[in-house]
Every structure is written in structure tokens, then in C-alpha cells.
Amino acid sequence: VNLKKAIIESSDVYFYELATKTSVDKISSFLKSFGFDTITGIDMFGEGFGILPNRKWKLGNIGESWFVGDTVNLGIGQGYITTTPMQLAVAVSAIANKGKVIRPRIVEKVNDVYTSPEVKGEILLKDISDWMTMEKAMVDVIESWQGTAHNLFVEGDLRLAGKTGTAQIKSLFEDDLTVKEEYLDIRKDKEKRDHALFVGYGPVPDPKLTVVIVIENGESASTIAAPIAKKMLNSYIKSKS
């Protein structure tokens, strides 16, 4: 399994191994450049920072050292990390804009004088072609039969780039149950079910809109969250045509 295939099929194992080969310090530093662990600057009061954990954060807030298992969790966006939907939107927009991190704004309409995009920063990669590699993988999340959101693809339809995800809100810790048994037990209480997420942008190759869908306790990103994102993108494109 390579990186592209891991993104398309959402392979946790690949990212477990990648995280342990990197380090929590490098992962946290790179994620910070996408806007995590800071407010986005949108014109709203009370915006949250989220949590971007590292060794210092865990020692200060949990009172424990950082373990390899924590890095493994961070590698798939689980564990101590928390984000806001707006932070996710800024991060996904950075991929769409090939590294440019844009400050989100609330506006009535767009004009060049007052609402031109404000670039907060730029993520510099050693190989800029990696942005296109990421975009192709996110397109295949939808267009490939192996993609976790392949149910969205319609031949001849507008091309979208996206990624499904789930946010686990209930830890698995029952020693006397298998993982499957514990998940089935968790599902009995709807409020403990995983959140369903989908992030994406389109149309590719000239994206105009980024969408982030979070369905609390929705469980299935591909069948619940992703179709909502597609409807939003379709409606936006139709309104501009």
C-alpha cells in the first residue's frame, strides 16, 4: 500500500506506520502550518483553538509522558487532537490552493477592494508536485471503485476531491469484549456513536468551493456526510452557471 492508495481506501494501518516513522514533533509542527491549534481569524466571536497535542501539551495537561501509541492515534486524527469545522475548511482549502493558507471571511458579496483573499501563510513542500498527488488521491476517493466515497461518482458529472473520516467519541477499553463486540455495545447509545465527516472541494481542476460536513453520531461518512457535500457543491456550481 502506498500513500495514494492509503488515502483512497482510508487505510489506518498505513498511517499508523507513517506516524511512528515520523515523530509527534514533526507531525504537530506540520499540522500547525495548516492552521490547526490556532483560530482561523473568521469574523465571528468565540472561535475555538482546538487541541494539537505534543509531548509538552500532554505532560502539562494530562500529567503523563508521550507514548508511541499517542503518536499512532495522532497519525489518523484520533486521540487527544480536536479541531473545529472551520479549521478543517482552512486546511482543505490549503490543499486546493496548493499551499496557500487563506483567512476565511463572512461577506455578503465579493469585490476586489474589500474582499480579495487574505493569504495568512504558505506551506512550502520540497516537491510541489506533492500537492497534485494529494489532489489526485482525493479525486479517486470519489472516482475509484476502491474509494471510500465512490458512491458519489457519476460519469460526466463535475469532478470533486474529497476525504471521508470518522471522529471516535467513545474510547474502547473493555478487556472482556472484542473490538467488534464493544462497537456493537456502543451503538446501543446513539450519543456514543462516531461522528461522520467529509471534507472536499471542487470543481477540479479549478476549485471554487470548499465544504466540510460533520454529522454528529452519523457513523457513516460515505453514505451520510459525503452526499450532503456533493449536493452543496452542485447547488453552488448551478447558481454560478
Describe the residue ranges of each PLM region.
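A generic structural motif
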Residues: 216-219
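Beta-lactam-recognizing serine transpeptidase/beta-lactamase-like catalytic domain environment
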Residues: 1-212
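Short amphipathic alpha-helical face segments that pack within enzyme cores
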Residues: 84-90, 224-231
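Short acidic, gly/pro-rich beta-turn/loop elements at beta-sheet edges
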Residues: 209, 221-223
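Short, gly/Ser/Thr-rich active-site loops of penicillin-recognizing serine hydrolases
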Residues: 115-123, 227-241
